């Protein structure tokens, strides 16, 4: 038995210099990263920025156009400052996207490891559960779950995480299946290493790259899904600022004051586009074979 056979799986590591060099080659990804960082900083600094209260109603100033004195981006149908509501809505969208994708990742990775490493009834149970959830249309199943739990951001995040974790389960299980019979895993098992040690030292390192890539691409999808539920009245509830609910309440004024709909719609578009471009760059960096 050689030491090489017992060596733990390599962990994908990239230096900061290599990351900067890879990003500099992709102008779109760099611009998307800058935009994303600015959005995150604005969202985090919202309580300390000189912005109007996003929930304060000012009926005489309702539906003001952009560049109105005191309202750089105009107001909505209740006279609330759209700039303030967009910034505060970014906090909700980022929380929903990262939180929902994170919850789906934790559940999906755990079930994927269990279903891929262990055989028998455990594997069958995990995969049948995954197949059942993936058999339903994504957003329709989320709507059904929220309808049962009740409207609200927390329940919407739970629902989207439930319908989203099977993606991680299938991804992780496929990786675990490919390495559970490898020589270094068999050698560790023959030497009496317990399963938790084998999983931590030999399996988890192989999962880092695909899971990081999947998560970076999934956050944008989760933001879009939570915005969709809020648009339907099942997510964030009034008067909390949320891009999806801003679209829902402003759509009736799309002809009279199109900025009420265009601004939150543009915010969702740019946020999701930035996340997808950054996710693609992360994928190309961690797995150069995917670069066309």
Regions from the PLM with identified roles:
Residues 85, 184-191, 199:
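Helix-loop-helix units of permease transmembrane domains in multi-pass membrane transporters
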Residues 1-109, 113-114, 120-121, 128, ...:
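Gly/Trp-centered helix-boundary motif
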Residues 72, 76, 82, 106, ...:
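Generic hydrophobic transmembrane alpha-helix motif, especially the helices
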Residues 92-96, 111, 123-127, 154-158, ...:
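Short alpha-helical transmembrane interface motifs in multi-pass membrane proteins
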Residues 39-43, 143-147, 160-166, 217, ...:
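Alpha-helical transmembrane segments of multi-pass membrane proteins
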Residues 43, 47, 113-117, 146-148, ...:
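Transmembrane helix-loop junction
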């Amino acid at each position: 038995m050689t030491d090489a056979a017992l060596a733990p799986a390599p962990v994908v590591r990239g230096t900061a210099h290599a990351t900067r060099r890879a990003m500099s080659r992709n102008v779109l990804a760099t611009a998307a990263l800058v935009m994303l960082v600015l959005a995150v900083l604005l969202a985090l600094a919202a309580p300390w920025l000189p912005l109007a209260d996003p929930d304060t109603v000012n009926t005489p100033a309702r539906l003001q156009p952009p560049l109105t004195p005191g309202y750089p981006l105009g107001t909505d149908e209740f006279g609330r400052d759209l700039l303030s509501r967009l910034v505060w809505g970014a906090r909700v969208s980022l929380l929903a996207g990262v939180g929902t994708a994170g919850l789906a990742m934790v559940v999906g990775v755990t079930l994927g490891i269990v279903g891929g490493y262990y055989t028998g009834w455990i594997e069958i149970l995990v995969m049948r559960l995954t197949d059942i959830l993936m058999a339903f249309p994504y957003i329709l199943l989320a709507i059904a779950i929220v309808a049962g739990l009740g409207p609200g951001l927390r329940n919407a995040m739970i629902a989207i995480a439930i319908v989203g974790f099977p993606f991680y389960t299938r991804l992780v299980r496929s990786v675990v299946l490919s390495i559970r019979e490898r020589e270094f895993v068999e050698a560790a098992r023959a030497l009496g290493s317990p399963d938790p040690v084998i999983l931590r030292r030999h399996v988890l390192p192989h999962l880092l790259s695909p899971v990081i890539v999947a998560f970076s691409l999934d956050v944008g999808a989760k933001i879009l899904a939570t915005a969709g539920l809020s648009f339907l009245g099942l997510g964030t509830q009034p008067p909390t600022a949320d891009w999806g609910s801003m679209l829902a309440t402003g759509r009736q004024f799309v002809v009279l004051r199109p900025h009420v709909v265009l601004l939150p719609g543009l915010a969702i578009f740019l946020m999701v586009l930035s996340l997808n471009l950054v996710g693609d760059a992360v994928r190309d960096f961690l797995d150069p074979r995917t670069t066309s």
